[in-house]
Amino acid sequence: MVATGGDRGYSGGRMIRFGPLALGSRLFLSPLAGYTNLPFRLVVREIGGVGLATTDLVNARSLLEKRPKALKLIETCPADRPLAVQLFGSVPEEMRDAAVYLESIGMASIDINMGCPVRKVCKVGGGAAMMTE
């Protein structure tokens, strides 16, 4: 999806569109491994200017199995909206089911990671490994 909008500043009070989302800023908080947890996202949002924040990488299978680590990564609150979740995995059905689950609990966007070169992600067929076939 492409973000479009009018002003050139970081927010300026004008809404921009990201697919169906109307955002107050063209700045997005990208996923940063080990950092983009709920407290970090809230601090960044409090500073201001963020239109959409994204979680750290979440393993689709772990999310479907309701593993505590995966649930902690998607932890959110009303002040942390809109929120995108970055999913990784290698089984299409698990990716689909995880995306459907995330949509059902109100996540604004799903980001499928197909670029992470980290060994532990690629060795299970996720991240950049998805682009090899």
Model-derived segments and their meaning:
Residues 20-21:
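N-terminal, post-signal-peptide segments of secreted/periplasmic proteins
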Residues 29:
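An anion-binding catalytic pocket shared by soluble metabolic enzymes
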Residues 58, 115-117:
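Short, ordered loop/turn segments at secondary-structure junctions
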